[in-house]
């Protein structure tokens, strides 16, 4: 069975956007519910999403497993999977990994651009890799069922996460650095190791990740997709649009 999945969206959520996703035939979307929020603030985001689910239950529902993607396709709805762009909601307490999973989190980045308690972000000058605490958190994420996302992480930290995780990881929204040398984009070394480990890459439409930014040409993007598939294989490459509808340009 084939599914249409967007591996990352970050929008100012409304019924209009959910309708657009349905018109696009998306069976599932991974949404950012946390950037830098702590645990209590994450719970507030959950309450906000509960209201969205209740008001738009003909279009969306909370996704928690692969089976929910099949369910969404059959019911002509979109399954919404919660993800964190940072590890801030678990604070410095490994027990919160299971707690956030219970409230629907299914993806968590180990860091967002900068150094965290778990790993090094892509904007740091020195990449010390996954920390000791990060190693323990990876084990716990594997245990409870949260996908490790290294989209905003530095090279060595990303390679460490691939090696340390007993389950495939994801880079949900980034592009290859061979196409555009943004700090957020990933090297061929990472792409190959990600694919070999069973992980997946979601290609991004975000301007800062694109060659020529907002002037990026469709042909150029498609050529990049084809070359990435040559490196990783067609089953390891998806889309992580980083759609930011109704958000300010800044």
Language-model-derived ranges and their functions:
Residues 89-91, 102-185:
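Divalent metal-binding pocket/active-site signature
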Residues 1-127, 181-239, 243-250:
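N-terminal hydrophobic targeting/anchoring segments and the immediately downstream early-domain regions
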């Amino acid at each position: 069975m084939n599914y249409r999945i967007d591996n990352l969206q970050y929008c100012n959520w409304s019924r209009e956007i959910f309708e657009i996703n349905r018109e696009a035939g998306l069976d599932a979307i991974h949404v950012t519910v946390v950037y830098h929020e702590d645990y209590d603030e994450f719970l507030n985001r959950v309450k906000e999403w509960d209201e969205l689910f209740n008001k738009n239950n003909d279009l969306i529902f909370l996704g928690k497993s692969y089976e929910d993607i099949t369910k969404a396709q059959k019911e002509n709805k979109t399954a919404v999977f919660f993800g964190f762009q940072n590890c801030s909601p678990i604070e410095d307490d490994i027990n919160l990994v299971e707690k956030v999973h219970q409230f629907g989190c299914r993806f968590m980045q180990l860091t967002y651009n900068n150094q965290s308690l778990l790993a090094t972000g892509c904007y740091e000058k020195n990449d010390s890799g996954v920390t000791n605490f990060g190693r323990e958190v990876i084990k716990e994420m594997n245990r409870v069922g949260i996908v490790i996302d290294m989209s905003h992480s530095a090279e060595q930290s990303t390679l460490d996460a691939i090696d340390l995780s007993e389950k495939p990881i994801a880079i949900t929204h980034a592009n290859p650095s061979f196409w555009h040398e943004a700090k957020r984009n990933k090297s061929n070394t990472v792409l190959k190791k990600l694919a070999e480990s069973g992980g997946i890459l979601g290609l991004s439409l975000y301007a800062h990740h694109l060659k020529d930014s907002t002037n990026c040409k469709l042909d150029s993007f498609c050529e990049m997709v084809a070359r990435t598939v040559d490196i990783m294989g067609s089953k390891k490459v998806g889309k992580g649009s980083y759609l930011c509808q109704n958000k300010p340009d800044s």
